[in-house]
Protein backbone atom coordinates (compact mmCIF):
# COMPACT_ATOMS: atom_id res chain seq x y z
CA UNK A 1 0.00 0.00 0.00
CA UNK A 2 2.88 2.33 0.73
CA UNK A 3 4.16 1.98 -2.83
CA UNK A 4 1.04 3.56 -4.33
CA UNK A 5 -1.46 4.47 -1.66
CA UNK A 6 -3.51 6.69 -3.97
CA UNK A 7 -4.20 3.84 -6.35
CA UNK A 8 -5.81 1.50 -3.85
CA UNK A 9 -9.26 3.02 -4.20
CA UNK A 10 -9.00 2.76 -8.00
CA UNK A 11 -7.95 -0.88 -7.74
CA UNK A 12 -10.91 -1.60 -5.47
CA UNK A 13 -13.41 0.21 -7.73
CA UNK A 14 -15.67 -1.48 -10.27
CA UNK A 15 -14.68 -0.54 -13.85
CA UNK A 16 -18.37 -0.34 -14.75
CA UNK A 17 -19.90 1.87 -12.05
CA UNK A 18 -16.55 3.42 -10.88
CA UNK A 19 -17.62 2.91 -7.25
CA UNK A 20 -16.11 0.65 -4.61
CA UNK A 21 -16.96 -2.97 -5.25
CA UNK A 22 -20.32 -4.18 -4.00
CA UNK A 23 -20.46 -7.99 -3.78
CA UNK A 24 -17.42 -8.30 -6.07
CA UNK A 25 -17.02 -11.29 -8.39
CA UNK A 26 -13.97 -12.21 -10.45
CA UNK A 27 -14.51 -13.66 -13.93
CA UNK A 28 -12.47 -16.53 -15.37
CA UNK A 29 -10.42 -14.00 -17.32
CA UNK A 30 -9.34 -12.26 -14.07
CA UNK A 31 -11.39 -9.05 -14.30
CA UNK A 32 -13.52 -8.12 -11.29
CA UNK A 33 -16.90 -6.36 -11.17
CA UNK A 34 -19.83 -5.75 -8.88
CA UNK A 35 -22.10 -8.75 -9.41
CA UNK A 36 -25.08 -6.52 -10.23
CA UNK A 37 -23.02 -4.40 -12.66
CA UNK A 38 -21.79 -7.47 -14.56
CA UNK A 39 -25.31 -8.87 -14.94
CA UNK A 40 -26.70 -5.46 -15.94
CA UNK A 41 -24.06 -4.65 -18.57
CA UNK A 42 -23.56 -8.14 -20.01
CA UNK A 43 -27.22 -8.50 -21.04
CA UNK A 44 -28.91 -11.75 -22.03
CA UNK A 45 -26.63 -14.82 -21.83
CA UNK A 46 -25.90 -16.97 -24.88
CA UNK A 47 -27.34 -20.45 -25.36
CA UNK A 48 -24.53 -21.95 -23.26
CA UNK A 49 -25.22 -19.51 -20.40
CA UNK A 50 -22.14 -17.35 -20.97
CA UNK A 51 -21.81 -13.59 -21.38
CA UNK A 52 -18.90 -11.55 -22.72
CA UNK A 53 -16.56 -9.92 -20.22
CA UNK A 54 -17.10 -6.13 -20.59
CA UNK A 55 -13.32 -5.58 -20.49
CA UNK A 56 -11.89 -8.30 -22.76
CA UNK A 57 -14.96 -10.04 -24.28
CA UNK A 58 -13.88 -13.42 -22.90
CA UNK A 59 -16.85 -15.71 -22.11
CA UNK A 60 -17.88 -16.01 -18.48
CA UNK A 61 -20.87 -17.27 -16.48
CA UNK A 62 -21.90 -14.56 -13.97
CA UNK A 63 -24.50 -16.74 -12.24
CA UNK A 64 -21.85 -19.34 -11.43
CA UNK A 65 -19.32 -16.88 -9.94
CA UNK A 66 -18.85 -16.71 -6.17
CA UNK A 67 -18.29 -13.48 -4.26
CA UNK A 68 -14.57 -12.65 -4.00
CA UNK A 69 -14.17 -12.55 -0.19
CA UNK A 70 -10.66 -11.07 -0.27
CA UNK A 71 -11.84 -8.12 -2.35
CA UNK A 72 -14.86 -7.73 -0.09
CA UNK A 73 -12.67 -7.50 3.03
CA UNK A 74 -10.36 -4.97 1.38
CA UNK A 75 -13.34 -2.89 0.33
CA UNK A 76 -14.76 -3.03 3.86
CA UNK A 77 -11.43 -1.85 5.30
CA UNK A 78 -11.16 0.93 2.75
CA UNK A 79 -14.70 2.04 3.41
CA UNK A 80 -13.71 2.97 6.96
CA UNK A 81 -11.33 5.61 5.60
CA UNK A 82 -13.16 8.96 5.26
CA UNK A 83 -14.03 9.89 1.68
CA UNK A 84 -11.34 12.12 0.16
CA UNK A 85 -8.57 11.08 2.56
CA UNK A 86 -5.39 9.09 2.04
CA UNK A 87 -5.83 5.44 2.90
CA UNK A 88 -2.31 5.30 4.39
CA UNK A 89 -1.88 8.65 6.13
CA UNK A 90 -5.56 9.63 6.58
CA UNK A 91 -4.69 13.16 5.37
CA UNK A 92 -6.92 15.00 2.85
CA UNK A 93 -6.27 14.24 -0.84
CA UNK A 94 -5.32 17.79 -1.86
CA UNK A 95 -2.68 17.22 -4.55
CA UNK A 96 -3.03 15.68 -8.06
CA UNK A 97 -0.17 13.58 -9.43
CA UNK A 98 -0.09 14.07 -13.23
CA UNK A 99 2.34 11.20 -13.70
CA UNK A 100 0.14 8.59 -11.97
CA UNK A 101 -3.12 10.47 -12.65
CA UNK A 102 -4.36 10.15 -9.08
CA UNK A 103 -5.10 12.25 -5.99
CA UNK A 104 -2.56 12.08 -3.16
CA UNK A 105 -2.08 13.71 0.23
CA UNK A 106 0.70 16.12 1.18
CA UNK A 107 2.75 13.42 2.89
CA UNK A 108 2.64 11.15 -0.20
CA UNK A 109 3.65 14.11 -2.38
CA UNK A 110 6.58 15.32 -0.28
CA UNK A 111 7.89 12.17 1.38
CA UNK A 112 6.11 9.18 -0.14
CA UNK A 113 6.10 7.36 -3.46
CA UNK A 114 4.97 10.44 -5.44
CA UNK A 115 7.97 12.55 -4.43
CA UNK A 116 9.55 14.15 -7.50
CA UNK A 117 6.48 13.56 -9.72
CA UNK A 118 4.65 16.28 -11.63
CA UNK A 119 2.21 17.58 -9.02
CA UNK A 120 -0.61 20.14 -9.09
CA UNK A 121 -2.96 21.51 -6.45
CA UNK A 122 -6.27 19.66 -6.71
CA UNK A 123 -8.21 22.83 -7.61
CA UNK A 124 -5.81 23.71 -10.45
CA UNK A 125 -5.88 20.12 -11.72
CA UNK A 126 -9.68 20.15 -11.69
CA UNK A 127 -9.81 23.34 -13.73
CA UNK A 128 -7.26 22.03 -16.23
CA UNK A 129 -8.88 18.62 -16.64
CA UNK A 130 -12.34 20.12 -17.05
CA UNK A 131 -11.15 21.75 -20.25
CA UNK A 132 -10.50 18.24 -21.63
CA UNK A 133 -14.04 17.03 -20.98
CA UNK A 134 -15.59 18.37 -24.25
CA UNK A 135 -12.93 16.64 -26.34
CA UNK A 136 -13.33 13.39 -24.44
CA UNK A 137 -17.10 13.66 -24.73
CA UNK A 138 -16.74 14.16 -28.48
CA UNK A 139 -14.47 11.12 -28.73
CA UNK A 140 -16.99 9.14 -26.75
CA UNK A 141 -19.85 10.25 -29.01
CA UNK A 142 -17.83 9.41 -32.13
CA UNK A 143 -17.05 5.97 -30.72
CA UNK A 144 -20.73 5.49 -29.93
CA UNK A 145 -21.72 6.50 -33.47
CA UNK A 146 -19.21 4.06 -34.96
CA UNK A 147 -20.47 1.25 -32.79
CA UNK A 148 -24.10 2.16 -33.49
CA UNK A 149 -23.36 1.92 -37.22
CA UNK A 150 -21.67 -1.42 -36.64
CA UNK A 151 -24.67 -2.60 -34.63
CA UNK A 152 -27.02 -1.45 -37.40
CA UNK A 153 -24.95 -3.32 -40.01
CA UNK A 154 -24.92 -6.47 -37.90
CA UNK A 155 -28.65 -6.25 -37.25
CA UNK A 156 -29.24 -5.82 -40.99
CA UNK A 157 -26.99 -8.78 -41.72
CA UNK A 158 -28.89 -10.81 -39.14
CA UNK A 159 -32.16 -9.97 -40.89
CA UNK A 160 -30.58 -10.85 -44.25
CA UNK A 161 -29.38 -14.19 -42.88
CA UNK A 162 -32.84 -14.98 -41.55
CA UNK A 163 -34.42 -14.02 -44.89
CA UNK A 164 -31.82 -15.98 -46.87
CA UNK A 165 -32.39 -19.06 -44.72
CA UNK A 166 -36.16 -18.64 -45.04
CA UNK A 167 -35.91 -18.39 -48.83
CA UNK A 168 -33.50 -21.33 -48.96
CA UNK A 169 -35.81 -23.51 -46.90
CA UNK A 170 -38.75 -22.46 -49.02
CA UNK A 171 -36.88 -23.23 -52.25
CA UNK A 172 -35.68 -26.59 -50.91
CA UNK A 173 -39.18 -27.48 -49.76
CA UNK A 174 -40.67 -26.42 -53.09
CA UNK A 175 -38.13 -28.30 -55.23
CA UNK A 176 -38.13 -31.44 -53.10
CA UNK A 177 -41.93 -31.27 -53.00
CA UNK A 178 -41.96 -31.23 -56.80
CA UNK A 179 -39.56 -34.18 -56.82
CA UNK A 180 -41.73 -36.13 -54.42
CA UNK A 181 -44.84 -35.37 -56.49
CA UNK A 182 -43.06 -36.39 -59.70
CA UNK A 183 -41.71 -39.62 -58.20
CA UNK A 184 -45.08 -40.44 -56.65
CA UNK A 185 -46.81 -39.87 -59.99
CA UNK A 186 -44.16 -41.94 -61.79
CA UNK A 187 -44.47 -44.75 -59.26
CA UNK A 188 -48.25 -44.70 -59.65
CA UNK A 189 -47.91 -44.75 -63.45
CA UNK A 190 -45.44 -47.65 -63.40
CA UNK A 191 -47.65 -49.50 -60.92
CA UNK A 192 -50.63 -49.09 -63.25
CA UNK A 193 -48.53 -50.32 -66.16
CA UNK A 194 -47.38 -53.34 -64.15
CA UNK A 195 -51.01 -54.04 -63.18
CA UNK A 196 -52.05 -53.79 -66.84
CA UNK A 197 -49.31 -56.20 -67.89
CA UNK A 198 -50.30 -58.60 -65.13
CA UNK A 199 -53.94 -58.41 -66.19
CA UNK A 200 -53.21 -58.91 -69.89
CA UNK A 201 -50.78 -61.73 -69.18
CA UNK A 202 -53.25 -63.36 -66.79
CA UNK A 203 -56.04 -63.31 -69.36
CA UNK A 204 -53.76 -64.75 -72.05
CA UNK A 205 -52.34 -67.42 -69.78
CA UNK A 206 -55.74 -68.49 -68.46
CA UNK A 207 -57.04 -68.73 -72.04
CA UNK A 208 -54.00 -70.81 -73.00
CA UNK A 209 -54.36 -72.95 -69.90
CA UNK A 210 -58.01 -73.67 -70.70
CA UNK A 211 -57.13 -74.60 -74.27
CA UNK A 212 -54.32 -76.91 -73.15
CA UNK A 213 -56.51 -78.60 -70.53
CA UNK A 214 -59.18 -79.23 -73.17
CA UNK A 215 -56.59 -80.68 -75.56
CA UNK A 216 -55.08 -82.78 -72.79
CA UNK A 217 -58.54 -84.20 -72.04
CA UNK A 218 -58.89 -85.24 -75.70
CA UNK A 219 -55.55 -87.04 -75.55
CA UNK A 220 -56.58 -88.92 -72.42
CA UNK A 221 -59.87 -89.93 -74.02
CA UNK A 222 -58.00 -91.28 -77.04
CA UNK A 223 -55.74 -93.21 -74.67
CA UNK A 224 -58.78 -94.95 -73.18
CA UNK A 225 -60.16 -95.71 -76.66
CA UNK A 226 -56.85 -97.32 -77.65
CA UNK A 227 -56.95 -99.52 -74.58
CA UNK A 228 -60.52 -100.58 -75.39
CA UNK A 229 -59.67 -101.36 -79.04
CA UNK A 230 -56.73 -103.53 -77.99
CA UNK A 231 -59.13 -106.06 -76.39
CA UNK A 232 -61.48 -106.31 -79.37
CA UNK A 233 -61.74 -109.44 -81.59
CA UNK A 234 -59.71 -109.48 -84.78
CA UNK A 235 -62.33 -108.17 -87.21
CA UNK A 236 -63.61 -105.46 -84.87
CA UNK A 237 -60.03 -104.53 -83.87
CA UNK A 238 -58.93 -103.96 -87.46
CA UNK A 239 -62.03 -101.93 -88.32
CA UNK A 240 -61.80 -99.69 -85.24
CA UNK A 241 -58.02 -99.39 -85.24
CA UNK A 242 -58.02 -97.56 -88.58
CA UNK A 243 -60.69 -95.16 -87.35
CA UNK A 244 -58.96 -94.56 -84.01
CA UNK A 245 -55.50 -93.94 -85.49
CA UNK A 246 -56.97 -91.60 -88.07
CA UNK A 247 -58.69 -89.64 -85.28
CA UNK A 248 -55.51 -89.66 -83.20
CA UNK A 249 -53.39 -88.23 -86.02
CA UNK A 250 -55.96 -85.49 -86.51
CA UNK A 251 -55.87 -84.58 -82.81
CA UNK A 252 -52.06 -84.58 -82.75
CA UNK A 253 -51.92 -82.35 -85.80
CA UNK A 254 -54.19 -79.84 -84.05
CA UNK A 255 -51.86 -79.42 -81.06
CA UNK A 256 -52.04 -75.74 -79.99
CA UNK A 257 -48.73 -73.82 -80.34
CA UNK A 258 -46.92 -72.76 -77.13
CA UNK A 259 -47.94 -69.35 -75.81
CA UNK A 260 -45.64 -66.40 -76.50
CA UNK A 261 -46.06 -63.62 -73.98
CA UNK A 262 -44.40 -60.25 -74.61
CA UNK A 263 -44.10 -58.79 -71.12
CA UNK A 264 -42.57 -55.32 -71.54
CA UNK A 265 -41.67 -53.58 -68.28
CA UNK A 266 -38.72 -51.24 -67.62
CA UNK A 267 -35.58 -52.95 -66.41
CA UNK A 268 -34.66 -51.46 -63.03
CA UNK A 269 -31.00 -50.65 -63.70
CA UNK A 270 -28.66 -47.65 -63.62
CA UNK A 271 -29.98 -46.64 -67.04
CA UNK A 272 -33.53 -46.73 -65.71
CA UNK A 273 -32.52 -44.43 -62.85
CA UNK A 274 -30.76 -42.10 -65.29
CA UNK A 275 -33.84 -41.93 -67.52
CA UNK A 276 -36.00 -41.17 -64.48
CA UNK A 277 -33.58 -38.39 -63.48
CA UNK A 278 -33.75 -36.85 -66.96
CA UNK A 279 -37.54 -36.92 -66.90
CA UNK A 280 -37.59 -35.44 -63.42
CA UNK A 281 -35.18 -32.69 -64.54
CA UNK A 282 -37.70 -31.59 -67.14
CA UNK A 283 -40.57 -31.85 -64.66
CA UNK A 284 -38.73 -29.49 -62.29
CA UNK A 285 -38.50 -26.71 -64.86
CA UNK A 286 -40.71 -23.65 -64.22
CA UNK A 287 -44.11 -23.64 -65.86
CA UNK A 288 -43.99 -22.85 -69.56
CA UNK A 289 -44.08 -19.09 -70.20
CA UNK A 290 -46.99 -18.00 -72.39
CA UNK A 291 -44.98 -15.69 -74.63
CA UNK A 292 -46.23 -13.88 -77.71
CA UNK A 293 -44.34 -12.09 -80.46
CA UNK A 294 -44.40 -8.28 -80.45
CA UNK A 295 -45.49 -7.23 -83.97
CA UNK A 296 -44.27 -3.66 -83.42
CA UNK A 297 -40.71 -4.96 -83.05
CA UNK A 298 -40.76 -7.29 -86.08
CA UNK A 299 -38.62 -6.62 -89.14
CA UNK A 300 -40.80 -5.53 -92.11
CA UNK A 301 -40.20 -8.91 -93.81
CA UNK A 302 -41.70 -10.84 -90.92
CA UNK A 303 -45.33 -11.93 -90.70
CA UNK A 304 -46.70 -12.49 -87.19
CA UNK A 305 -49.87 -14.56 -86.82
CA UNK A 306 -52.97 -13.14 -85.15
CA UNK A 307 -52.33 -15.37 -82.14
CA UNK A 308 -48.86 -13.89 -81.75
CA UNK A 309 -47.25 -17.33 -81.54
CA UNK A 310 -46.15 -17.91 -85.14
CA UNK A 311 -43.70 -15.85 -87.21
CA UNK A 312 -42.18 -16.39 -90.64
CA UNK A 313 -40.17 -14.46 -93.19
CA UNK A 314 -42.18 -13.50 -96.26
CA UNK A 315 -40.67 -13.93 -99.70
CA UNK A 316 -42.43 -10.76 -100.81
CA UNK A 317 -40.46 -7.55 -101.03
CA UNK A 318 -41.02 -5.67 -97.79
CA UNK A 319 -41.26 -1.90 -97.34
CA UNK A 320 -38.41 -0.21 -95.47
CA UNK A 321 -38.61 -0.01 -91.69
CA UNK A 322 -40.19 3.04 -90.13
CA UNK A 323 -38.71 5.46 -87.63
CA UNK A 324 -39.87 3.50 -84.60
CA UNK A 325 -36.70 2.50 -82.72
CA UNK A 326 -38.51 -0.51 -81.26
CA UNK A 327 -38.50 -2.13 -84.73
CA UNK A 328 -35.62 -4.13 -86.18
CA UNK A 329 -34.59 -2.55 -89.46
CA UNK A 330 -31.71 -4.84 -90.51
CA UNK A 331 -31.90 -8.03 -88.46
CA UNK A 332 -34.81 -10.25 -89.54
CA UNK A 333 -35.84 -10.63 -85.92
CA UNK A 334 -38.63 -10.02 -83.42
CA UNK A 335 -38.83 -9.90 -79.62
CA UNK A 336 -41.53 -11.10 -77.26
CA UNK A 337 -44.04 -8.68 -75.82
CA UNK A 338 -43.20 -9.91 -72.31
CA UNK A 339 -40.32 -8.22 -70.45
CA UNK A 340 -38.44 -10.52 -68.05
CA UNK A 341 -36.77 -8.87 -65.06
CA UNK A 342 -36.52 -11.32 -62.15
CA UNK A 343 -37.11 -14.89 -61.04
CA UNK A 344 -37.03 -18.03 -63.18
CA UNK A 345 -38.48 -18.45 -66.67
CA UNK A 346 -38.73 -21.28 -69.19
CA UNK A 347 -40.06 -21.19 -72.74
CA UNK A 348 -39.88 -23.38 -75.81
CA UNK A 349 -39.64 -22.60 -79.51
CA UNK A 350 -40.52 -25.00 -82.30
CA UNK A 351 -37.83 -24.60 -84.98
CA UNK A 352 -38.68 -27.75 -86.94
CA UNK A 353 -36.31 -28.41 -89.83
CA UNK A 354 -35.53 -24.71 -90.32
CA UNK A 355 -31.84 -24.59 -91.40
CA UNK A 356 -30.98 -21.16 -89.94
CA UNK A 357 -32.20 -19.39 -86.80
CA UNK A 358 -31.01 -17.82 -83.54
CA UNK A 359 -32.72 -17.63 -80.15
CA UNK A 360 -31.93 -16.09 -76.78
CA UNK A 361 -32.49 -12.87 -74.86
CA UNK A 362 -31.83 -9.20 -75.59
CA UNK A 363 -31.22 -6.43 -73.06
CA UNK A 364 -34.21 -4.10 -72.85
CA UNK A 365 -32.01 -1.07 -73.61
CA UNK A 366 -30.04 -2.70 -76.46
CA UNK A 367 -30.37 -1.06 -79.87
CA UNK A 368 -32.47 -2.80 -82.51
CA UNK A 369 -31.33 -0.58 -85.35
CA UNK A 370 -28.63 -1.50 -87.80
CA UNK A 371 -26.75 -4.75 -87.97
CA UNK A 372 -26.71 -6.49 -84.61
CA UNK A 373 -23.39 -7.42 -83.00
CA UNK A 374 -24.61 -10.58 -81.29
CA UNK A 375 -22.35 -10.74 -78.22
CA UNK A 376 -23.15 -10.37 -74.50
CA UNK A 377 -21.31 -7.03 -74.21
CA UNK A 378 -23.84 -5.62 -76.70
CA UNK A 379 -26.80 -6.98 -74.74
CA UNK A 380 -27.38 -10.17 -76.76
CA UNK A 381 -27.12 -13.76 -75.53
CA UNK A 382 -27.87 -16.05 -78.48
CA UNK A 383 -27.65 -19.65 -79.66
CA UNK A 384 -28.25 -20.40 -83.33
CA UNK A 385 -28.17 -22.97 -86.11
CA UNK A 386 -26.25 -22.44 -89.34
CA UNK A 387 -26.42 -24.44 -92.58
CA UNK A 388 -28.92 -26.80 -91.01
CA UNK A 389 -26.30 -28.63 -88.94
CA UNK A 390 -23.89 -26.34 -87.05
CA UNK A 391 -25.02 -25.08 -83.65
CA UNK A 392 -23.30 -21.84 -82.63
CA UNK A 393 -23.09 -19.97 -79.32
CA UNK A 394 -22.62 -16.22 -79.78
CA UNK A 395 -20.00 -15.65 -77.09
CA UNK A 396 -17.65 -12.69 -76.58
CA UNK A 397 -15.44 -13.36 -79.61
CA UNK A 398 -14.99 -12.33 -83.23
CA UNK A 399 -16.75 -15.47 -84.43
CA UNK A 400 -19.50 -17.56 -82.78
CA UNK A 401 -18.33 -20.67 -80.97
CA UNK A 402 -19.23 -23.80 -82.93
CA UNK A 403 -20.67 -26.49 -80.68
CA UNK A 404 -20.63 -30.25 -81.13
CA UNK A 405 -22.57 -31.03 -84.29
CA UNK A 406 -25.62 -33.14 -83.37
CA UNK A 407 -26.60 -36.16 -85.43
CA UNK A 408 -29.99 -34.57 -85.88
CA UNK A 409 -30.56 -30.84 -85.27
CA UNK A 410 -33.11 -30.18 -82.52
CA UNK A 411 -36.67 -29.58 -83.69
CA UNK A 412 -37.60 -27.76 -80.50
CA UNK A 413 -35.44 -25.56 -78.26
CA UNK A 414 -36.06 -25.02 -74.55
CA UNK A 415 -34.65 -21.89 -72.88
CA UNK A 416 -34.24 -21.57 -69.10
CA UNK A 417 -33.42 -18.19 -67.53
CA UNK A 418 -32.60 -17.61 -63.85
CA UNK A 419 -31.82 -14.04 -62.80
CA UNK A 420 -30.80 -15.10 -59.28
CA UNK A 421 -28.32 -17.75 -60.49
CA UNK A 422 -27.15 -15.82 -63.55
CA UNK A 423 -27.90 -18.67 -65.97
CA UNK A 424 -29.32 -18.77 -69.49
CA UNK A 425 -29.43 -22.41 -70.60
CA UNK A 426 -30.46 -23.92 -73.94
CA UNK A 427 -31.86 -27.45 -74.25
CA UNK A 428 -32.92 -29.81 -77.00
CA UNK A 429 -36.60 -30.20 -76.09
CA UNK A 430 -37.54 -32.40 -79.05
CA UNK A 431 -38.29 -35.32 -76.72
CA UNK A 432 -41.41 -34.43 -74.70
CA UNK A 433 -40.04 -36.31 -71.68
CA UNK A 434 -36.36 -35.34 -71.68
CA UNK A 435 -34.32 -32.14 -71.90
CA UNK A 436 -30.82 -32.51 -73.37
CA UNK A 437 -28.39 -29.67 -72.49
CA UNK A 438 -26.86 -27.79 -75.43
CA UNK A 439 -25.13 -24.69 -74.01
CA UNK A 440 -25.33 -22.27 -71.08
CA UNK A 441 -24.32 -18.66 -70.45
CA UNK A 442 -23.23 -18.11 -66.84
CA UNK A 443 -23.30 -14.41 -66.00
CA UNK A 444 -25.50 -11.95 -64.16
CA UNK A 445 -27.74 -10.09 -66.58
CA UNK A 446 -27.38 -6.30 -66.19
CA UNK A 447 -31.14 -5.70 -66.20
CA UNK A 448 -34.47 -6.67 -67.76
CA UNK A 449 -34.41 -8.61 -71.04
CA UNK A 450 -36.75 -9.57 -73.87
CA UNK A 451 -36.74 -13.05 -75.43
CA UNK A 452 -35.48 -12.54 -78.98
CA UNK A 453 -36.13 -14.65 -82.08
CA UNK A 454 -33.88 -14.21 -85.12
CA UNK A 455 -35.93 -15.77 -87.92
CA UNK A 456 -33.20 -15.01 -90.49
CA UNK A 457 -33.72 -14.28 -94.20
CA UNK A 458 -35.92 -16.75 -96.11
CA UNK A 459 -33.02 -17.46 -98.52
CA UNK A 460 -35.26 -17.78 -101.58
CA UNK A 461 -37.49 -20.30 -99.87
CA UNK A 462 -34.72 -22.44 -98.37
CA UNK A 463 -35.28 -20.95 -94.90
CA UNK A 464 -38.97 -20.10 -95.10
CA UNK A 465 -40.05 -22.36 -92.25
CA UNK A 466 -41.71 -20.48 -89.36
CA UNK A 467 -40.80 -20.26 -85.70
CA UNK A 468 -43.54 -21.30 -83.28
CA UNK A 469 -43.83 -20.35 -79.64
CA UNK A 470 -44.91 -23.42 -77.70
CA UNK A 471 -47.78 -22.75 -75.31
CA UNK A 472 -50.50 -24.68 -73.52
CA UNK A 473 -52.16 -25.15 -76.89
CA UNK A 474 -49.40 -25.27 -79.47
CA UNK A 475 -50.17 -23.52 -82.77
CA UNK A 476 -49.58 -25.69 -85.79
CA UNK A 477 -47.67 -24.44 -88.77
Swiss-Prot record:
Changing residue 29 to A: Does not affect homooligomerization. The modification S-nitrosocysteine is found at residue 144. Specifically binds phosphatidylserine. The binding to phospholipids enhances ubiquitination activity. SMART domains: BBOX, PRY, RING, SPRY. It is an enzyme of class 2 (transferase). It is found in: Cell membrane, Sarcolemma; Cytoplasmic vesicle membrane. Disulfide bond formation at Cys-242 occurs in case of membrane damage that cause the entry of the oxidized milieu of the extracellular space, resulting in homooligomerization. Zn(2+) 3 binds at residues 86, 89, 105, 108. It comes from the Eukaryota. Changing residue 74 to R: Abolishes ubiquitination activity. A zinc finger (RING-type) spans 14-57. It catalyses: S-ubiquitinyl-[E2 ubiquitin-conjugating enzyme]-L-cysteine + [acceptor protein]-L-lysine = [E2 ubiquitin-conjugating enzyme]-L-cysteine + N(6)-ubiquitinyl-[acceptor protein]-L-lysine. Zn(2+) 2 binds at residues 29, 31, 53, 56. Disruption phenotype: Viable until at least 11 months of age under unstressed conditions, and develop progressive muscle pathology with age. Mice show progressive myopathy and reduced exercise capability, associated with defective membrane-repair capacity. One of its GO terms (biological process) is protein homooligomerization. Pathway: Protein modification; protein ubiquitination. SUPFAM superfamilies: B-box zinc-binding domain, Concanavalin A-like lectins/glucanases, RING/U-box. Zn(2+) 1 binds at residues 14, 17, 34, 37. Changing residue 106 to R: Impairs binding to phosphatidylserine liposomes. Its main location: membrane. GO terms for molecular function: identical protein binding; mitogen-activated protein kinase kinase kinase binding; phosphatidylserine binding; ubiquitin conjugating enzyme binding; ubiquitin protein ligase activity; zinc ion binding. Residues 271-475 form the B30.2/SPRY domain. Residues 135-232 form a coiled coil. The RING domain is flexible in both the dimer and oligomer. Binding to the negatively charged phosphatidylserine lipids is mediated by the positively charged PRYSPRY domains and is inhibited by Ca(2+). Belongs to the TRIM/RBCC family. This is Tripartite motif-containing protein 72. It comes from Mus musculus. The gene is Trim72.
Amino acid sequence: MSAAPGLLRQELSCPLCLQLFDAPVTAECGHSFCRACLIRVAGEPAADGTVACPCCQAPTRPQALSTNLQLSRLVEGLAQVPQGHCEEHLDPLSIYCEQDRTLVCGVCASLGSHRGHRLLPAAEAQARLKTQLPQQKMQLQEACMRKEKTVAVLEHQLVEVEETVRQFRGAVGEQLGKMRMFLAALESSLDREAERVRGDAGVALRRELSSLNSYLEQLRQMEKVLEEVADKPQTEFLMKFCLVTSRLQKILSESPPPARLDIQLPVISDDFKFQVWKKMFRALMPALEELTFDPSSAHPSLVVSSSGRRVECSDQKAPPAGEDTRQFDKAVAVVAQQLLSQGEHYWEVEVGDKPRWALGVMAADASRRGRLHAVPSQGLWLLGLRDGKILEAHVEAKEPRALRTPERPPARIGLYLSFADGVLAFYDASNPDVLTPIFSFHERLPGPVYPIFDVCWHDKGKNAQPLLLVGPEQEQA
